[in-house]
Amino acid sequence: MGVISPTETLFLKSQHRLLQPRNYSYALAFHSTRRVANFPRNSFSSLGSCSVDFPLRSNPISQNSKSIHPWRRYVSESDSNELYHKKVSSIMETLKQAYSFIPHGILLSTILALVYPPSFTWFKPRYFVPGLGFMMFAVGINSNERDFLEALKRPDAIFAGYIGQYLIKPLLGYIFGVIAVSLFNLPTSIGAGIMLVSCVSGAQLSNYTTFLTDPSLAALSIVMTSISTATAVLVTPMLSLLLIGKKLPVDVFGMISSILQVVITPIAAGLLLNRLFPRLSNAIKPFLPALTVIDMSCCIGAPLALNIDSILSPFGATILFLVITFHLLAFVAGYFFTGFFFSKAPDVKALQRTISYETGMQSSLLALALATKFFQDPLVGVPPAISTVVMSLMGVSLVTIWKNRKE
C-alpha cells in the first residue's frame, strides 16, 4: 500500500463536502445558454484547484433579486427599456415628419371627395373656422413674439403683399372673367364668379403654407393676411363694383369676428402656451403635424364634396381650366414681382415664396359666401367653389416643390 500524499489526504478528508458544493453568487455562462452552474463531482485536479471544461463569464446581477437567476431579470429589463425608448423616439420622429405627407393627404381627400362625397359632407361649413384656427394655433405654438416684431419692421414687404392681393390678383381676375365670357362663351355669371374670387382678401391657408416652407417668414405672412382681411370691408365692395358692376356689402363685424376666430385668438393661444407652459408646449408639438395633415385634408376635401354638383356641371371642365390658369399666373406674378423689387434683400427667395402664396391664394370661401348671399344666379358660386380646392392643392404642391429644392 503506497504512501498517501498530503494533497490526496486533503481530498479524502474533504470529499463529503466536495460532492455537493454550494452555489456561488455569480453567474456562469455556458455558450449561449446562461445559467448558475454547480461544480461537477470530479472537477478538482490533483492540485485541488477548480477547473471546468467550458468557458466562464461573470455577469452583473441584481443584489436584491429573489430569483435563482437574477441576471435574467436584469438583462430583460434593460433590453426592454432600451427597446421602449427606441420605439418612442421612432414614433415621435415620424409624427414630426408628418408634414411630408401633406400632398398624400390632399390627394387622398380629393379622390375620396370625388368618388364618395359623403366621406366629407359631414364636415360642414361651420367647421371651417375652427379647422383653419387649428392650423393657426400650430403656427403660433412654433413662433414667438420676436417674429411678429421683426415682421412689422418690414413695411415695404407688407405693402408688396398688399399690392399682390389687391392689384395684381384683381387685374388677373378681370382678364380671366372677360376671357371666360368672350372666348369660351360661358354665361356672364361665371365670369362674375371668377372676378369675385379676385376681389376678396388673402387666404389664411397661405400663412400655413409659408410656415411649412419658410418658418421665419410665417409672422410676416400672418401680418399681410390680417391687414388684407381687415381692409376687405372697404376694398372688396369697391373692387366688386369696379369689376362686376355690383357693389357687394361686406359684413364689418363678421370680418372682424373672422379675423379674431381664425387668426388672432389661435395664434395668441399658441404664443402664450409657449411662454407660460413650455413643457406642455414641447409635449404637444410632436403631435401637431399629424393632426394638421388630417385637419387640412378635411378643409380641402369638404368644399369639394359639398360642391360636387357644381364642379361636375356642364361648364365644370372649362371653369376648372380657367381657374387653374388664373391661380397659376397669380402665383407666378407674385413670385417675379417680388424678385424684381426686392432683388437686393438677403432673404429674397424666401420673400418671393411668401408673397407668391399671398398673391395666389385668396379667401375663396368668403367669395363663395358672398356669391350665395348677394347673387340670385347660383352659377356665380361655381368658380369660388372650384377655386377653394384648386387654390389649396396648388399651394400645397408648391410647398412640396420648394421644400425639396431647399433641401
Swiss-Prot record:
One cellular-component annotation, GO: membrane
Record-annotated membrane-spanning stretches: 101-121, 122-142, 162-184, 191-213, 222-242, 252-272, 286-306, 317-337, 379-399
GO MF entry, a single one: monocarboxylic acid transmembrane transporter activity
Membrane topology of this protein: Multi-pass membrane protein
InterPro entries from the UniProt entry: BilAc:Na_symport/Acr3, Bilac:Na_transpt, Na+/solute_symporter_sf
UniProt KW keywords: Chloroplast, Membrane, Plastid, Transit peptide, Transmembrane, Transmembrane helix, Transport
Tissues in which the UniProt entry reports expression: Widely expressed.
Family per similarity comment: Belongs to the bile acid:sodium symporter (BASS) (TC 2.A.28) family.
Name used for this protein in its record: Probable sodium/metabolite cotransporter BASS5, chloroplastic
Gene responsible for this protein: BASS5
